[in-house]
Amino acid sequence: GAQAVGIAWTDGDQIGVFDQEAVNQRCYSKVGAEREALASFTAAGEAFAEPTYAYYPYDAANDNKEITSLTGNLPAVQNMDSGILHGDYKYGRAKGSGASGHEFAFTHMFSLARVTVDASGTPLAGDKLREVSVSVTRNDAPVAVAGQFEFNARNGVWKQTDAGSGTVSLQWTDGPQLNSSLTAYMSMFPTVKSGDTFTITVSTQNYRACFSAQSLADFQRENIYGLPLQLKNYSSLVVYDKEGNLEYPTEGVKTGTFTCATLNVDGLPSGINSDGPGKQGTVTLGNKANLQGWDFLAVSEDFEYHTQLATAMSNYNAGTYRGSLGVLNLSQRADTDGLGFFWKKGLSATGETMVQYTAEIGGLTDGANTLIKKGFRHYVVTVADGVDVDVYITHMNTWSDKDPSSFEPVQIAQLCQLRDYVLAQLKQNKRPAIVMGDTNMRYTRHKVQDNFITPIAQAGYEAIDPWVKFHRNGEFPTWGGKSLMIRSNFKGDTKNDICCSDDQRGEVVDKVWYINHPLSSVQLQAVGCRNDVENFVKSTEAAEYKGVTIEDANGNILTNQTVSFERKIGLADHFPVVVDFKYTIIKK
């Protein structure tokens, strides 16, 4: 249902006011600290003789803009700690004047959703609320309900100026307990139509509940729409604990496990890379991989020694091999992506699709990126009866510390191309997805969160990095900091690197992310993650460095330290990144 929105002005509110000609603008501030429906405002400086138009909230960034092209942001994440409503944009028009000044009538530009959470009869009852997120889709495509916009303060007409977010989240740092029904309000663009799908997630300190519902109305501005979330009444309700284990429902549920890995096999011809494993080293590498029991493996730089690798991996089937590079003719682009995919015999991998990246940079002496057709591949892997997973494997552009301003935009463009493809398939197929490979990226030097993690969240999903979950306490490394090196990869660079306490806490460029579709009957949960150093050691050597910055096992950063350790040298120049998964099949 819907009802008209009321207005309650609070202490600290400010409005932008235009004069009769709608040319000059000034900031007016609320008088008094009371919360009230009718409030008085006073100008900062000389007041207008005929104030005529107004908008809320005032933003100094709009001071020099025309009344028809003001800008605003309805935030996708709305923090509820202070109880203040976010994104509550209004426009006002003078009604007349009297002894107390000019009277304005304000109209809300957007819609409000009254979210009432009742967790009684579910595991969430009595737990502390952390977040309520509402994602909106129409025919499986996200509906933008938050984002940047431009508006006209004369009449409240607005238009979106970015891609927007299909999800709005209310968040609490130390939220209330769900002992009884709780009501909160979220601002949304009035873009929701009758029949649109709401995918709702309620997260507490120890649980996460997911379910879906249909919109019964076309949202209009200046209206409140009720979202009565009595959780136990939703037949689509699924509840997980904080570790991702299924709590509800329990009937008709099947579970199982599988393991995947990603590895750069360093397979350039020895004429180009004399330090690579070569034929015999690749045989050893393949034999080691063959014995690990992984269910499927993504490899990159699978060029010259594919035959040796595939023969050694006798327990596996392989995807298309696209060839090597011609050592004697490096002026021509080789028709290969260097990618390889292996899956255990008895499983199936279908729908092989190859996509070349449109952005690229770097010739023979700058990463050799343009000598091949770098890109990504897409497979549908059936790991068990009824368990299909979309798997994406990739090898991205190299990074250059000599010219990062040229190389980083290309890498980000490739990441965004991959992200958009994955999101499109996710919406269409409603299957869980795994994205893995040599990204040549680090969270510390590339804006991976801004361009991959966050946009996927804004689309209503969650991209999870098991390494962040298991080895970084769920916190992404800070962008712009020094590289967090695993022990075996630390070479004493005190200017750019931090030596981590072991071979697990450090970051490598080989990534594995996974994304669940909330409406899928198959859900994935990472239950383990490791850089498999121990099984892929060629040799060891003693290492000692002085005056270095280290990170200890508790995450403390210590400067000017002396470290000594046994460095493990791999069979290739990368170690495998391995992730163990648990899958759950929910009969809905």
Predicted regions and their residues:
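Sec-type signal peptide cleavage vicinity
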Residues: 1-254
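Residues within well-ordered beta-strands of beta-sheet-rich folds
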Residues: 18, 53-55, 112-116, 259-261, ...
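N-terminal, active-site-proximal structural segment of metallo-dependent hydrolase catalytic domains
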Residues: 235-314, 331-336, 573, 580-588
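Metal-dependent phosphoester-hydrolase catalytic domains
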Residues: 241-248, 424-433, 441-588
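Active-site beta-strand/loop signature of hydrolases that rely on acidic residues for catalysis
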Residues: 259-265, 285-309, 342, 379, ...
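Acidic/histidine-rich helix-loop elements
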Residues: 262-283, 361-370, 397-410
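Short catalytic/ligand-binding loop motif for oxyanion handling, primarily in non-cytosolic enzymes
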Residues: 268-271, 305-308, 330-340, 350, ...
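Structured beta-strand-rich core segments of catalytic domains in phosphoester-bond hydrolases
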Residues: 299-399
